[in-house]
Amino acid sequence: MSQPPWRCFSLLIFVLTIFSTKPSSASTSCSSSFHCPPFNSSPPYPFSASPGCGHPNFQIQCSSSRATITIKNLTFSILHYSSISSSLTLSPITNTNRNTNNCSSLRFSSSPNRFIDLTGSPFRVSDSSCSRLSLLRPCSPFTLPNCSRCPWDCKLLKNPGRILHGCESTHGSLSEQGCQGDLLGFLQDFFTRFGFEVEWDESQDPYFIKCRDCQIKNGVCGFNSTHPNQDFICFHKSRSELVTQRDNNKRVNHIAVLSLIFALTCLLLVFSVAVAIFRSRRASFLSSINEEDPAALFLRHHRSAALLPPVFTFEELESATNKFDPKRKIGDGGFGSVYLGQLSDGQLLAVKFLHHHHGATAAATEHCKAFSMKSFCNEILILSSINHPNLVKLHGYCSDPRGLLLVHDYVTNGTLADHLHGRGPKMTWRVRLDIALQTALAMEYLHFDIVPPVVHRDITSSNIFVEKDMKIKVGDFGLSRLLVFSETTVNSATSSDYVCTGPQGTPGYLDPDYHRSFRLTEKSDVYSYGVVLMELITGMKAVDQRREKRDMALADLVVSKIQMGLLDQVIDPLLALDGDDVAAVSDGFGVAAVAELAFRCVATDKDDRPDAKEIVQELRRIRSHTRVADDDVAKN
């Protein structure tokens, strides 16, 4: 009779345990393995449950269910850890014994009894968590029972975003009724079930910098837990330990051979059981591929399913684009190709297929996949929460192992770049001025009407889509970023409000100050918009290698001509050939006024640049004077 499989594996573990040695030094103590959910194995650096190990601000306590971490005297349960994005999903552990008799009607006992402020710690609340809170509809406290006895709960009901320091609600008005149950239920789920995401920046923390050097030297990272400064310590193994380790490695090799023989014997005895387990696991894996899709899990974690756009299957979009027929390709960029798709109901839509990055190394491929996934999810989260006539609308998405796809409005008349630099018909000055104003209105909406504000980061003539009636829509939000500031600066509109992030964008449009300082603000979009204005004036490309080196960037060329009083040398000659545009070219409120505005937009010091509201006001003033001038020319 064969031995039960559990006895074979128990005996194997017993043999390995006999020959194993117990580490005794501080370094081996810090590197010892132990189980600590939700980490798949031992918590990696910077986390540690041992005093003096890891990072002093990332000390955790392990339990059988979930690890906990204390940040600024608040204890949180760790629901999820992502090594790719350096983020944690936390749920606050509240005092279940606190007195809630006076607030029983509010049913708010499982939420924090004060706002969560991470200022002064390495952590910051992620953009996506702030975005989820900002969509909540506030309640009026005057319609709630016991509001005078529960001032904190009432403050939250007036502004739910207050519970996370730095997040605010996008809804300014208070609802008189019908919101309490929805709001409290959402907050209960937000903290107890889903949690909120926090991030940290390893590049700015000296502990991480020193730890990388320590690990290169085969050291173990820790700190002096007995000193107030908690100085970094790199634990190095002594010579005797290294010799012992080499001996142990030899012994482990022998043990491995014996163990392998023993394990094979057990596997032969329980072969039928192993086959059954394999078939069961394979069937379970195949049935759960779609359920475990990382993009779908990420989106459901950061946004309610009711707020997300519809989901298409890969087969639906493959059929709509005739298997991604090259003849249906209507655009191609750095992040993906765009195809014309026709759904079963006859609706025409644009299907954006993100690139696969074939032919790259394994490491580069994984990096590109992570970046594409982040860009994909980022565009879905932002576009699903905005609504403006001059911004493209997201109709749905598809996350499939075969590809990531986004379904947008199909704009039939190409891009602004097509009209200015190639395939499109000639554009009059009045049309160009209207396009400039519509683009500015879209930028104003992103910067001032959304909380937290959105920086597009890629406003270019290729991302401005033109409809048949010459109305425009700004698209491609893959690089967009939410600006989440602290409570002291959230109501400010100065350029000192910024987030630190790696420069991304299109050459020729990228803000040089952002490129140098890594500080992203709304004024970075203003710079890109200024380059688009220069394209409208000159008809030239933002970057043209056929021009002289000093004039290769359009911004440099136009700025130098304006400073020398030679603007007329770079004005699009097609404007001067059109009789209707003569007044605009010669009048001070026409092309010259827009050129002056573009000059201000690309100012070296971002404090000298106008904001989106100022740009809209100035363009409206210019347009009104231009129309008066056109009418005078028509009368004569």
Swiss-Prot record:
Enzyme class: transferase
Catalytic residues (positions): 458
Residue ranges annotated for the Protein kinase domain, each copy included: 324-628
Sequence positions that bind ATP: 330-338, 352
Keyword Transferase in annotation: yes
Known EC number: 2.7.11.1
InterPro entries per record: Kinase-like_dom_sf, Prot_kinase_dom, Protein_kinase_ATP_BS, Tyr_kinase_AS, WAK_GUB
Organism: Arabidopsis thaliana
Topology Cytoplasmic: residue spans: 279-636
Compartments where found: Cell membrane
Protein name, per record: LEAF RUST 10 DISEASE-RESISTANCE LOCUS RECEPTOR-LIKE PROTEIN KINASE-like 1.5
Keyword Cytoplasm: no
